[in-house]
């Protein structure tokens, strides 16, 4: 066994561990840890369960204010721009879809009759 250790390309510490473990019944582990994790910050990604995350009417992200609410968004923080989901699972800003419904009672994306499923954030 010692001849094999002499011929192998190993570090000094590893060859001593091999020689010690051949003399003992249980292997002795004296290696230091390569690194230790002291703090772990987990990151998660998520998305809404909707077909489109932009309002197809005003082209803004559904969680940002619509073009009607943008001018007053900085000054009036009490009013929220609420999203509206249809039964077709398409989401629009409530202001945008209300204007759309006045001219045409269908979803702007799939042309199905518009039915409100839920409203809110």
From Swiss-Prot:
Changing residue 72 to R: In RBX1-1; temperature-sensitive allele. At 38 degrees Celsius induces defects in ubiquitin ligase activity. It comes from the Eukaryota. Zn(2+) 3 binds at residues 88, 90, 107, 110. Zn(2+) 1 binds at residues 55, 58, 93. Pathway: Protein modification; protein ubiquitination. Changing residue 81 to R: In RBX1-1; temperature-sensitive allele. At 38 degrees Celsius induces defects in ubiquitin ligase activity. GO terms for cellular component: chromosome, telomeric region; Cul3-RING ubiquitin ligase complex; Cul8-RING ubiquitin ligase complex; cullin-RING ubiquitin ligase complex; cytoplasm; nucleus; SCF ubiquitin ligase complex. It is found in: Cytoplasm; Nucleus. Component of multiple cullin-RING ligases (CRLs) composed of 4 subunits: the RING protein HRT1, a cullin, a linker protein, and one of many alternative substrate receptors. Component of SCF E3 ubiquitin ligase complexes containing the cullin CDC53, the linker protein SKP1/CBF3D, and substrate receptors containing F-box motifs like DAS1 or GRR1. Component of RTT101(MMS1) E3 ubiquitin ligase complexes containing the cullin RTT101, the linker protein MMS1, and substrate receptors belonging to a protein family described as DCAF (DDB1- and CUL4-associated factor) like MMS22. This is RING-box protein HRT1.
